[in-house]
Design a protein with these regions (language model features):
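Formylglycine-dependent sulfatase
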Residues: 1-285
Length: 285
């Protein structure tokens, strides 16, 4: 593909699969993160509410409607978060002001508005994309973090030195990281990991609320649902915490659930390797 890394821009001559769905009669919409960056390509959405960054470290121009929401409610962004963990910290505000809570609520709102319009028979394709789970890991101090006991959490046994046993592409990747476990205490790391888990739990809760809207309008059984992520984090593997651009198990092994439009579908676990690139082709079929 002549693409050295994922940080690249789609040329205007390309056509997204959302655009193809739109051309074939679907109403297309997105709420949340897209990461098209500086590309000026037509994304192919009829409706857009894009929030590209992960608060609180993202440039303000990427946070758009989320910052507007905070301002409308008299919330100063810097008051919501205290940095006191490894690449993360403690959430100090009401959880309803967290960016992933905001995205989830807006996704639920879109779904409610769409399905309540019973006169509209046009098929739809909806992307709900959460900025998290992502550094900074900012949900320590919340009810979601309280679900996890530090004593029950695992501390990675692999270290930065273990990279020396691997190929050059792995031996060199550590130099690009700025976060090393050796610089922190075990408690600091476990709280950071708990905050990461808490972010996942918050997102799971918000997705559940959207699914309940589908069930409320008897649309769940007829809807294809794809749940996935773009990457994982090291979370202690090789003594690293965040992510890097490399082919490493903890970064690449992400969830990919597909619920077909089949009533009472029980599920099948497929162990074959699959790629996110297959999602577009699956949607087009």
């Amino acid at each position: 593909c002549q693409v050295p890394a994922y940080i690249s821009y789609l040329p205007d001559t390309e056509k997204t699969f959302m655009k193809r769905l739109k051309e074939n009669g679907y109403y297309t919409a997105v709420v949340g993160k897209q990461h098209f960056a500086e590309s000026t390509i037509d994304k192919g959405y009829d409706y857009e509410m894009i929030v590209d960054g992960h608060f609180p470290t993202a440039p303000k121009e990427q946070l758009g409607v989320y910052l507007d929401y905070l301002k409308e409610n008299g919330i100063e962004p810097d008051s919501l978060y205290e940095k006191n963990l490894i690449s993360g910290g403690t959430w100090k505000g009401d959880i309803k002001y967290h960016i992933d809570n905001f995205i989830g609520d807006k996704g639920k709102e879109w779904m409610e508005n769409r399905l309540s319009d019973t006169e509209n028979k046009q098929p739809w394709f909806f992307t709900l994309s959460f900025p998290g789970p992502h550094h900074p890991y900012d949900l320590e101090g919340t009810k979601y973090a309280d679900m996890y006991e530090l004593n029950d959490m695992e501390f990675s046994e692999s270290t930065y030195e273990d990279l020396e046993q691997k190929g050059p592409q792995f031996r060199n990747m550590g130099m690009y990281s700025q976060i090393y476990l050796k610089d922190y205490t075990k408690e600091q790391f476990l709280k950071t990991k708990r905050s990461y888990y808490a972010n996942i739990t918050l997102i799971d809760e918000k997705i559940g609320e959207v699914l309940e809207v589908l069930k409320k309008y008897n649309a769940y059984d007829d809807t294809v649902i794809i749940y996935t992520s773009d990457h994982g984090d090291f979370m202690g593997d090789y003594g690293l915490v965040e992510k890097l651009q490399c082919l490493e198990e903890s970064l690449m092994r992400v969830p990919l659930f597909v619920k077909p439009p089949i009533k009472d579908f029980e599920g099948v676990h497929i162990k074959d390797d699959v790629l996110n690139i297959d999602v577009a082709a699956t949607c087009m079929e």
